[in-house]
Amino acid sequence: MIMSLSILYILPEILLALGVIVVMFSGLFLHGKIRNINYIFFQVFTLLALIATFAKEYLIQTTGLVFEGQVVFSGFAYTLQLVILVLAVFVALYSRDYVKDRKISDGDFYTLLMLCVLGAMVLTAAHSLVTIYVGLELLSLPMYALIAIYRDSGKGLEAAIKYFVLGAIASALLLFGMSFVYGMTGKLDITEIANVLAHGNFAGLQQQFLLVYLVMMIATFLFKLGAFPFHMWLPDVYQGAPNAVANIVATIPKVAAFAMLVNILFVGFPSLKDSWIYLFRIIGILSIFFGSLVALSQTNVKRLLGYSTVSQIGFVLLATTLNPQGYALTAASFYVIVYLFTTLAVFGVLTTISVGGYEVQDLNDLKGFNTKDSWLAFILLIVLFSMAGIPPFGGFIAKLFVVMGLINDGNYFLACFVLFMAVIASFYYVRVIKTMYFDDPDNDETVKPPLTSLIALSINGLVLLFLGIMPMLLLGVLTQVTNVI
């Protein structure tokens, strides 16, 4: 494919890279001269990238590779890239007043955020071991800086160091696994690796070593997702990071990590599916069990959300093990998207109300929240209902598809286990609702969220309701784009 045409396939990434440069220089030379200029530049370039990605998805109806197999263009990649960009727009919107209130450099904040978005976009479309590693580092490095960006918070620095150390170990595991896979196959392209494994003579000890190398690679992305037992960093980072940054950590990297798991497992290593499918079931079960039980004892809201994430990711991993493959990928993708928008809304509410000295950390901070802002409390109620899997919200449909898939596969015991743990998990969501609606507030501080955040949060809540009432619209798109993987 000619170079000029190939560049069109990465136009969104080019726009984001240009946006990084513009926001960085804007932060240096225009800071304080034009109100919200860095925020405006961020949203403009992100929306341009969103439009370019949307146009690509509907103008390009084929799947293929560009740049010598380094980048894949497919409906699946474009759909997840659209999700990343929508998340970025909402995260920035929720964060605008929070960043100003905490006197965080908005130039630094939006530059680092856009770098994270760019890294996630690259990682989602990566089709080569080299591109995967570059995308991962482009996503991770600015994330470490973002977690520690609020200089007045010692917990933020501690969380950043912990995340950096564990992230470095995860990256090293990925490199080790990649180098061994390259040594055995002589290929960097994921599709070519799959072809070598399918037609090569890999048996006995060689196949066992290959499985070990695969585990080393996917451990990195399980770490980014926060699955058990790679979750150690997650509650601490959620708690220590500023609320606006916690929203970023909880959403954008999850999309890219999920995309890479799908590409590596279903495109690169389908020949080892009989082995990794059992591994994912075990990790999924342990994630649901551990995350749900530990969350019950949490009094810090963000730590509770951290352990809740571990449990939710367990459902995603179980979904990837279902049959047939098209159903598995559709169910897992739908669950991920619903999870992302519920998490976006929860942290969006926490970020929006954590302005003017009112910082939400513990459950006690939400006592009587309904009396302070009944509309925000209602939105949070909707989101928590969705997380708990209560109809008619998107979370119910997402969990239902996983349970139905397990039943169709004959895994009745596992389906009963998932249902039981979903009931257990609902207790800690209900506890938050009870605190908001039935406990008396500890203080008389008022909450005055900006109108733009209220509108965005309302849209966020409507999306979750829409996904519960009319899920087939999104499921139809996901079925179409996952069938060609």
UniProtKB/Swiss-Prot annotation:
Localisation per UniProt entry: Cell inner membrane
Catalytic activity: a quinone + NADH + 5 H(+)(in) = a quinol + NAD(+) + 4 H(+)(out)
Assembly and binders: NDH-1 is composed of 14 different subunits. Subunits NuoA, H, J, K, L, M, N constitute the membrane sector of the complex.
Protein's recorded name: NADH-quinone oxidoreductase subunit N
Membrane topology, from the record: Multi-pass membrane protein
GO cellular component, one term: plasma membrane
GO biological process: ATP synthesis coupled electron transport
Classification via InterPro entries: NADH-Q_OxRdtase_suN/2, ND/Mrp_TM
Protein source organism: Francisella tularensis subsp. holarctica (strain FTNF002-00 / FTA)
Family assignment from sequence similarity: Belongs to the complex I subunit 2 family.
GO MF annotations in UniProt: NADH dehydrogenase (ubiquinone) activity; NADH:ubiquinone reductase (non-electrogenic) activity; quinone binding
EC number: 7.1.1.-
Function statement: NDH-1 shuttles electrons from NADH, via FMN and iron-sulfur (Fe-S) centers, to quinones in the respiratory chain. The immediate electron acceptor for the enzyme in this species is believed to be ubiquinone. Couples the redox reaction to proton translocation (for every two electrons transferred, four hydrogen ions are translocated across the cytoplasmic membrane), and thus conserves the redox energy in a proton gradient.
